[in-house]
């Protein structure tokens, strides 16, 4: 696994828009304030040509232009890391126009983004053997003040963070809108983890610890990549089978039945054959129940059969805040009741 160099004080942060750009509010103002904050912190900035573009469908521009931007800016020596402008809908089409041979030959650099950016973070690990950070996109850094999760994410890029913890509360409903683009997360809900060992719920005060190599992202994107020419998951699993895999997964548009279908699909594709544990984020359909199926049984239908720890409702994904996850890194996870710690090991 290749680990990028840390961004140094005074270094250059690059911004790209392989999914949505920051053309409309509240993202336009939030991205502008993020740039202001980074400059005040002493960093140089390099903006890709699509950061404010809105010509594309489900992404900032045409797939060709988005793929070209992503390839050129990742391989460029004029920036030291890349932060994606945002998530979106069709970044998979961007990846058809990314030159992965150039990415593999380039000096690795940190790439930060989540949601649709799974198309980059997952493929960097499985195709390019390069670590990246599954975490907040550029506009989030415009909030006033920063949430601790943003400090943690930027700390990973700087090399100052090697351990992340769960956050006290999470956001059920965002207050950020066109009139209030810089509002921080509206954290009102206490963090309550649902921990299982196989199908058995963990007891009060029970300490759970497991380690392995982190792989995963947004399930919507992962099952879309599965079986395509970009799916090199099998080779990755064999290379790192002695480490075992910690699968981190979260869902955006999937309802509870779609989550269960996604888990079945990944299981039948052999993706979970060396699993050491699951980290499951709060799904956007949090609290949904359909025909007797809830978000927990949707996951446990497969994960519960593996006799490994399954930690659900973790700070991960579309219901902020999220612990930034270093995709491809070795990690040790420690859980007790509602407390969770992830310690990264760059080997």
Where are these regions (language model features)?
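Buried hydrophobic positions in well-ordered alpha/beta secondary-structure cores of metabolic enzymes
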Residues: 15, 82, 116, 222, ...
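Conserved anion/nucleotide-ligand pocket segment
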Residues: 133-220
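Long, hydrophobic/aromatic-enriched structural stretches that serve as scaffold segments
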Residues: 75-98
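ATP/NTP phosphate-donor binding region
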Residues: 1-78
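Structural motif
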Residues: 81-83, 112, 246-248, 279
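Oxyanion-binding "anion nests"
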Residues: 213-252, 256
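Short, acidic/small-residue loops that bind anionic groups at enzyme active sites
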Residues: 98-124, 131-139, 309
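C-terminal active-site/capping subdomain that shapes the small-molecule cofactor and substrate pocket
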Residues: 256-347
């Amino acid at each position: 696994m290749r680990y990028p160099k840390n961004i140094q004080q005074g270094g250059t942060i690059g911004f790209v828009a392989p999914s949505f750009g920051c053309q409309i509010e509240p993202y336009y103002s939030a991205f502008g304030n993020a740039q202001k904050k980074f400059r005040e912190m002493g960093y140089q900035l390099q903006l890709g040509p699509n950061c404010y573009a809105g010509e594309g469908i489900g992404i900032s521009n045409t797939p060709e232009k988005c793929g070209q931007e992503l390839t050129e800016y990742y391989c460029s020596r004029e920036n030291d890391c890349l932060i994606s402008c945002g998530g979106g809908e069709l970044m998979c089409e961007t990846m058809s126009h990314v030159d992965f041979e150039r990415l593999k030959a380039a000096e690795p650099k940190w790439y930060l983004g989540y949601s649709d950016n799974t198309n980059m973070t997952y493929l960097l690990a499985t195709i390019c053997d390069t670590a990246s950070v599954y975490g907040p996109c550029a506009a989030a850094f415009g909030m006033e003040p920063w949430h601790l999760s943003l400090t943690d994410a930027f700390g990973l890029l700087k090399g100052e963070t090697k351990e992340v913890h769960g956050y006290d509360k999470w956001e059920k409903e965002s207050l950020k809108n066109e009139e209030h683009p810089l509002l921080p997360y509206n954290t009102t809900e206490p963090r309550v983890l649902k921990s299982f060992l196989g199908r058995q719920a963990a007891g009060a005060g029970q300490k759970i610890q497991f380690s392995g190599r982190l792989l995963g992202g947004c399930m919507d994107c992962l099952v879309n990549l599965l079986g395509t020419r970009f799916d090199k998951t099998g080779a990755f699993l064999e290379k790192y089978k002695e480490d075992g895999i910690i699968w981190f997964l979260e869902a955006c548009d999937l309802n509870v039945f779609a989550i269960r279908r996604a888990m079945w699909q990944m299981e039948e594709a052999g993706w979970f054959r060396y699993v050491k544990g699951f980290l499951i984020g709060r799904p956007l359909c949090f609290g949904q129940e359909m025909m007797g199926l809830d978000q927990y049984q949707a996951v446990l239908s497969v994960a519960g059969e593996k006799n490994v720890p399954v930690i659900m409702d973790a700070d991960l994904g579309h219901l902020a805040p999220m612990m930034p996850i270093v995709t491809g890194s070795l990690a040790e996870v420690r859980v007790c009741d509602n407390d969770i710690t992830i310690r990264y090991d760059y080997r």
